């Protein structure tokens, strides 16, 4: 008579060949996706941090952002784009992150930014220092006037040290930000 008590030996179930193939297929698919995402980010994108408070409230000091380096190969920056650039192409500088606001002519008068004679919708705060934009600036081909969303705490195209930004000095369009302080992750508007 057999004891029906504890049994420490159980028959092992064999894993079928089909199940193994399915598992490896999923693992390969996930690994390939991660690899392709890394290639896209490394070669077409860039990551950097915002330096300073010039883009508040849109972006905060130290906030991590992702830059699309490929977009401006196919098209040109548009008014409202948030871009990263090296001022005057200075490779030793940190990336400046500012908003493109201009068309052909830019001027700041009585604290208001005018683009082609019309009040700009991108800067609503009264600008205390017009800088070089006190006199009308006529932009050349592939030149852009870039300003911080917090213009009274921003070194931007109004500064003689920076001036209009040439398209060739732009790293790309900032398109996504990570969580910082009270701000969650999301697309840059």
Which stretches of residues belong to each language-model region?
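Short Gly/aromatic-enriched secondary-structure transition segments
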Residues: 81, 113, 161-163
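PP2C/PPM family metal-dependent serine/threonine protein phosphatase catalytic domain
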Residues: 111, 115-131
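Extracellular/periplasmic catalytic domains that process cell-envelope and extracellular macromolecules
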Residues: 58, 76, 106-107, 137-140
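Beta-strand-rich cores of mature extracytoplasmic or soluble domains
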Residues: 133-189
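Structural motif
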Residues: 63, 78-82, 104, 143, ...
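Mid-length scaffold segments of soluble, non-membrane domains
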Residues: 93-115
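Protein maturation boundaries and topogenic segments
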Residues: 1-93, 165-189
């Amino acid at each position: 008579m057999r004891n029906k008590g504890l049994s420490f030996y159980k028959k092992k179930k064999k894993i079928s060949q089909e199940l193994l193939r399915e598992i490896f297929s999923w693992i390969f698919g996930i690994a390939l996706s991660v690899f392709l995402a890394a290639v896209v980010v490394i070669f077409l994108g860039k990551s950097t941090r915002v330096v300073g408070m010039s883009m508040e409230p849109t972006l905060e000091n130290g906030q991590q952002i992702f830059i699309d380096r490929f977009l401006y190969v196919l098209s040109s920056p548009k008014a409202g784009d948030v871009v990263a650039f090296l001022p005057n192409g200075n490779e030793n500088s940190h990336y400046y992150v500012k908003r493109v606001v201009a068309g052909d002519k830019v001027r700041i008068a009585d604290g208001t930014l005018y683009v082609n004679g019309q009040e700009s919708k991108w800067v609503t705060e009264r600008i205390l220092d017009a800088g070089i934009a006190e006199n009308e600036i006529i932009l050349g081909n592939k030149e852009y006037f870039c300003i911080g969303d917090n213009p009274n705490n921003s070194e931007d195209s109004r500064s003689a040290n920076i001036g209009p930004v040439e398209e060739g000095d732009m790293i790309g369009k900032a398109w996504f930000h990570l969580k910082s302080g009270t701000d969650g992750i999301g697309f840059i508007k």
